[in-house]
UniProtKB/Swiss-Prot annotation:
Coiled coil location: none
Originating organism: Strongylocentrotus intermedius
This protein's name: Calmodulin
PANTHER family: CALMODULIN LIKE 3 (PTHR23048:SF0), MYOSIN LIGHT CHAIN 1, 3 (PTHR23048)
Sequence positions that bind Ca(2+) 3: 101, 103, 105, 112
Amino acid sequence: MSQELTINADQLTEEQIAEFKEAFSLFDKDGDGTITTKELGTVMRSLGQNPTEAELQDMINEVDADGNGTIDFPEFLTMMARKMKDTDSEEEIREAFRVFDKDGNGFISAAELRHVMTNLGEKLTDEEVDEMIREADIDGDGQVNYEEFVTMMTSK
């Protein structure tokens, strides 16, 4: 597992690492190379992340191996790399939803689905379109909302 985490941190650009180091240093008050768990949320928010308290606690528990309440820079990098990866996929799904939701009302209708699929070169019958909607339509209202779309996209 630790090998996989290292790979994630290795995928950061030098610019990203420098940016994270700068933010890390701002909150490493005594300059000893560690930040306290309380400061973690502030650091992440300064980098455009918006973790919940539960997410922060989970990340701290995963990273703070010795349980002393502080995080060193390599641990911090690992955590940020993982967090960035999660954010990207979430943003990609949101972007895909916007593509399908032509009128921006928060729902994908059969007509919108047919339109996008046709633009992608997929000629579907009405039955095929209805079947796709039915598969994703958890609450049975005949259209697909964002939550249903996320479920569909992440269940594969």
